[in-house]
Amino acid sequence: MNELEYVPVPAFEDNYIWLVSDGRDAIAVDPGEAAPVRRVLAERGWRLTAILLTHHHADHVGGVDALRNSQPDDAPLPVYGPAAEAIGVVTRPLAGGDRVTLDAPAVAFDVLDVPGHTRGHIAYFQTARQGAAGQGNAEPHVFCGDTLFSCGCGRLFEGTPAQMLASLDALAALPGDTRVHCAHEYTLSNIRFALACEPGNAALAAWRDDAQALRARGVPTLPTTIAHECAVNPFMRADSAAIHATLEAELHETVTDRLAAFTLMREWKNRFR
């Protein structure tokens, strides 16, 4: 059985469409544009076999129709996505607790409910490849859309702070070595805000230097890992006394608990420059 390859395909200004392939067949996660996906598929000689969607925003679903229309009539492309959102292109609606099992490539995902950015947002957690009895992946993977970014989280367009914090807690509970495939290259701007929240975080300062070096070479800062984000991401560190002290000093608000800290951080981030 071939190893799986995880390829970030740049789209728009800062999106990543993720392709997962065994060297022959591939699935696309959140294809907001069709052209970049088609280009990579053609360059590598891969066949697209399924699409996974995390939420309804146009920069995540806009390329689906074009990709489906380019498929042979005898090989319709299944499109998986959240049942709780009105996404017309979805043919296989999903909810948290469901499992997606694919044959080509042979891979399985557990579906996680992660509302906040949108009300019905889901994530896909890959634990083990189908048919590999007794064998797991070298590491797990999660495709989290716009819920979690490196050193950040998605804006709350539809959900509440409590929902988003619970969603981040659910992701934080995944194994620490889980590779986190975020949908945007926001890392450098997020690090600036994270350092404002927690200037004494040495791991965060080191990540700033590493991320700057990666971007200077045109290399993605993703995937990250759950353990790394728990060490550097202020939105996953809402119980940090250092962050609480910063929020009280900068915003002149009393931080009563981690939800209050998260809410203040998210509001601050919305206007941070």
Where are these regions (language model features)?
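Conserved beta-strand hairpin/beta-sheet module of binuclear metal-dependent hydrolase folds
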Residues: M1-W46, Y124-R129, G136-C144
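Active-site environment of divalent metal-dependent phosphoester hydrolases
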Residues: D14, A35-P36, H56-G62, A86-V89, ...
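Core dinuclear metal-dependent hydrolase active-site scaffold
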Residues: L19, R99-G136, A173
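Divalent metal-coordination and catalytic microenvironments
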Residues: V20, D30, H55, L67, ...
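Active-site neighborhood of phospho(di)ester-bond hydrolases with catalytic His/Asp-centered motifs
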Residues: V29, T49-H57, P78-A83, D113-G116, ...
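Active-site metal-binding motif and surrounding structural segment of the metallo-beta-lactamase
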Residues: A34-G81
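Active-site-adjacent loop/tail segments of enzyme domains
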Residues: G152-T178
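Accessory terminal helices/loops
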Residues: D169-R179, L188-R273
